[in-house]
């Protein structure tokens, strides 16, 4: 068993190095994607146009290996388009072909929804079931996708012909990760001037196919969750952080320009806390530890929790500034347990 765990650690190190080699300046996002794979959780990337979201998700899908489905979000996309398509065959008869969800079979490893905010709410509803249950009903039978991980991205710039994801759909994503352009000038220069980064298909092919064998991840994830421990003090720390995000005024949090007592419309759910714990355990395992430390919780709290915090309507227009400030205030206020 120990040798098997050692092999998995080596695979994750290789995958992280390969992904960082083809997607520059996104080390934090790559680590979070690996944590999500280890948790078997779905991921939504949000960012500006041209920041590498699609390239990163395609590279991650290649690292996982296995069948891979993809759909482009458009305003005229229908739920049935995910399941099947129809056309007139050469013999003049109508034919039904599997859509992007079914064409790869039940062994599908990754389903990638590009520009998810361009799809209508009816499509989001179908995706919600696929994410929540990893199953789908079609053609009088039930299809099950035990290895499925859903990746999606959305463009934060364009607002025309877009539809905001409902809270229920966003809550099904383990993480919502903000992707910005690389901060280091040398990375931006390399992306602009090195031809290697101009051919996206060839670049992604540099990532070894199936570095992280997807069929083994369910068993590994279960072992990580059962074998990575959290002390009573750490458990209390997680609880206090989540309570502070639910009721900042009671926790003594202060935010400039906001009334803490009126800030929150809906806070962290029990499922959100479960996801936080799962991600923190995966983070600890990737660091080679058998126990969760406060830094593991802090490393994953924002991407796991930010999209699960619902502000009062008066404060929602300032969400991008207030939610990070709220999380920082919780970190500053809630005492960190001793190691």
Curated annotation (Swiss-Prot):
GO process annotations (BP): methanol metabolic process
Pfam annotation, one family: AAA_3
Encoding gene, per UniProt annotation: moxR
Gene3D superfamilies attached to this UniProt entry: Magnesium chelatase subunit I, C-Terminal domain, P-loop containing nucleotide triphosphate hydrolases
Keywords assigned: ATP-binding, Cytoplasm, Methanol utilization, Nucleotide-binding
An annotated Gene Ontology molecular function: ATP hydrolysis activity
Record's protein name: Protein MoxR
Localisation per UniProt entry: Cytoplasm
Role noted for this protein: May be involved in the regulation of formation of active methanol dehydrogenase.
Protein family according to the UniProt entry: Belongs to the MoxR family.
GO CC annotations, alphabetized: cytoplasm
Binding site for ATP: 47-54
Stored InterPro entries: AAA+_ATPase (IPR003593), ATPase_AAA-3 (IPR011703), CbbQ/NirQ/NorQ/GpvN (IPR050764), ChlI/MoxR_AAA_lid (IPR041628), ClpA/B (IPR001270), P-loop_NTPase (IPR027417)
Domain of life: Bacteria
SUPFAM superfamilies: P-loop containing nucleoside triphosphate hydrolases (SSF52540)
